[in-house]
From Swiss-Prot:
Gene, per the UniProt record: rps2
Keyword Ribonucleoprotein: yes
A GO CC annotation given for this chain: small ribosomal subunit
SUPFAM superfamilies in UniProt: Ribosomal protein S2 (SSF52313)
One of the Pfam families matching this protein, by short name: Ribosomal_S2
Family to which the UniProt record says this protein belongs: Belongs to the universal ribosomal protein uS2 family.
Protein name: Small ribosomal subunit protein uS2
A GO biological-process term: translation
Superkingdom, taxonomy of origin: Archaea
Molecular function GO terms recorded: structural constituent of ribosome
Amino acid sequence: MDTLVPINVYVKAGIHIGTRHLTKDMKPYVSKIREDGLAIFDIRKIDERLRLASKMLSYYEPNEILVVGRRETAITPIKKFSEITKVKAFPGRYPPGTLTNPQLKYYMEPEVILITDPIMDKNALHDAYESGITILALCDTNHTKNYIDFCIPANNRGSKSLALIYWILAREYLRNRGVIGKDEQLKVPVEEFETKITVEE
């Protein structure tokens, strides 16, 4: 089966570059440890999980999905993803209680949540778990799968990696729901999903 984008596109975005810490949960998705200690994801496994995640999300209406991501490099990708798919999103800080406190004016009851970083977005992760919401998450090599129903292994830090991930998810969501043709591309290029920051962390 062909990959969702050519392998070299994944490589160029650095989607496979993990961290120097590798948990037992993420070991099955890693192909090697580089000489500098960085764990490297198996790109075909990333592709397979992105394909499955897109399929899962496509079973839900846009208003039944919430996407969160506090990391600076996630803000533009999430905004673009939300704009194109009409999915609800919290780019930036997630207000605690959004999923658990009906008294809040921004309270919502999504069926599924997509979390960009289970560590940085831990408030959203815990709220979703308490509410019984299906949890999908982008997991780097240093994460565990605690509370997570479906893990997408990937570099969830880099601006290019996150741009490509959310671009693919947007395209596949729209394709699977019949909004665009099976071979149709998004009218918005992947570059527009990228957060432009002057100094990389």
